[in-house]
């Protein structure tokens, strides 16, 4: 009995494994006629978003495709797109009294209309930071802030949040780092401080800066350098002559003092005689 029971169990297992194979043998499925004639809409082409952050647009082409694979009734449509709502920070350095404007929307998105968005501005006055804890509300409800005559007090970090009014979805956050300097503090003319070769490079031309030679100084600088050199040379020469004269006088005085000392040491009536 034990032997028959043992042989029955493996036989049952083999039969159990074979049944699914027989039950799932491939069969030809009949597709209904309605499905064979079905037509679907397929996106056949799409452009990238017009902006890399914030709300933008993209173009899509949608066609009807049937069982034969032929495209029919193709239409192009312009759709909103959002790849990333966080747009980083833009830095600006300005002089006091200049007119300036901050704008957190691109012209193409304004085609929808300013009324479709909600704009919230916040300010971290006097510092450049993206820490949300240092920002305080700033009174502005438009997509831009305009400074008629900017002052040092206006420096800091401005944050603009853009939301869709229909669902209050945040679609853009942009920071503006603003530095305001007095006009007599620094010369902001970067191009003026460049050398001739560097100006050519700045204009997009190829220049080998390894063979760069120092620029020629203006004529008035050469004259000043010559005058300074002559003055220094004259001063040194005069100092040497004065030193020679003083040394000569000191030698004469020292010689006279030595003769007087020797004369005092000789007996009365004695005189010094020059050697033959």
Swiss-Prot record:
It is a single-pass type I membrane protein. InterPro entries: Ig-like_dom, Ig-like_dom_sf, TMEM81. It comes from the Eukaryota. Its main location: membrane. GO terms for molecular function: protein-macromolecule adaptor activity. The keyword Disulfide bond applies. Disulfide bonds join 104-160. Residues 25-225 are extracellular. The keyword Repeat does not apply. Residues 83-176 form the Ig-like domain. The chain crosses the membrane at residues 226-246. Residues 247-276 are cytoplasmic. Glycans are attached at residues 45, 211. GO terms for biological process: sperm-egg recognition. SUPFAM superfamilies: Immunoglobulin. Keywords: Cell membrane, Disulfide bond, Glycoprotein, Immunoglobulin domain, Membrane, Signal, Transmembrane, Transmembrane helix. GO terms for cellular component: plasma membrane. It is found in: Cell membrane. Residues 1-24 form the signal peptide. Forms a complex with IZUMO1 and SPACA6 on spermatocyte cell membrane required for fertilization. Essential fertilization factor required for male fertility. Part of a conserved trimeric sperm complex with the essential fertilization factors IZUMO1 and SPACA6 which bridges sperm and oocyte membranes during fertilization by binding to IZUMO1R/JUNO on the oocyte. This is Transmembrane protein 81. It comes from Bos taurus. The lineage of its organism: Eukaryota, Metazoa, Chordata, Craniata, Vertebrata.
